[in-house]
């Protein structure tokens, strides 16, 4: 049994992003801007340049993801990734990323992706219809956001 190339590429990219987020100035600036952009400006961070770097990195990763998905399926259409954003948001929130910003880790996001992938495959395996799957995913997001807001309010 071999490891799929997509898993290897995802692991390498995750490791690189962990290094960027935890060991570089850009990563610390990203964390600061996510927590409070005004405080980041006051502390001397060039928010504009950092946001441009974030969007460039995100765009490159979206492109890599699209290429890998097209390679996996053998083709692509203009609406192929439709509703993937729901899965991405849900996986991030389940992985511990705060809706209020400034909180989250790369390992937490990976755990959220793995948990949500298991949920997706499990719902498909038991024969649940796609509309019910969307409802369940939405409920998971609502519950995760409610827990996040509760934690946020408890800190205040």
Please tell me what each predicted stretch does:
Residues 1-31:
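Alpha-helical transmembrane segments of multi-pass integral membrane proteins
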Residues 2-10, 51, 55, 109, ...:
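Residue-level signature of transmembrane alpha-helical entry/exit and packing/kink sites
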Residues 9, 46-69:
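Transmembrane alpha-helices
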Residues 14-22, 66-70, 95, 124, ...:
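Structural signal for membrane-spanning alpha-helices in multi-pass inner-membrane proteins
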Residues 15-16, 42-49, 121-156:
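Cytosolic-side transmembrane-helix boundaries in multi-pass membrane proteins
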Residues 23-25, 99-107, 154-156:
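Membrane-helix interface "capping/anchor" motifs
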Residues 26-51:
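Short cytoplasmic-facing helical segments at TM-TM junctions of multi-pass membrane proteins
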Residues 55-56, 61-63, 72-135:
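Transmembrane alpha-helical segments in multi-pass inner-membrane proteins
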């Amino acid at each position: 049994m071999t490891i799929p190339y997509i898993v290897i590429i995802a692991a390498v990219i995750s490791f690189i992003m962990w290094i960027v987020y935890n060991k570089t100035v850009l990563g610390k600036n990203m964390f600061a801007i996510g927590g409070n952009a005004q405080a980041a400006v006051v502390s001397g961070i060039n928010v504009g340049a950092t946001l441009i770097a974030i969007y460039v990195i995100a765009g490159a990763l979206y492109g890599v993801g699209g290429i890998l998905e097209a390679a996996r399926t053998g083709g692509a259409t203009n609406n192929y990734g439709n509703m993937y954003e729901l899965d991405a948001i849900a996986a991030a929130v389940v992985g511990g990323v705060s809706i209020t910003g400034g909180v989250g880790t790369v390992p937490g996001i990976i755990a959220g992706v793995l948990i949500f992938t298991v949920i997706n495959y499990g719902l498909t395996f038991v024969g649940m219809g796609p509309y019910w799957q969307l409802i369940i995913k939405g409920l998971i997001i609502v519950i995760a956001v409610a827990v996040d807001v509760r934690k946020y309010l408890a800190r205040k």
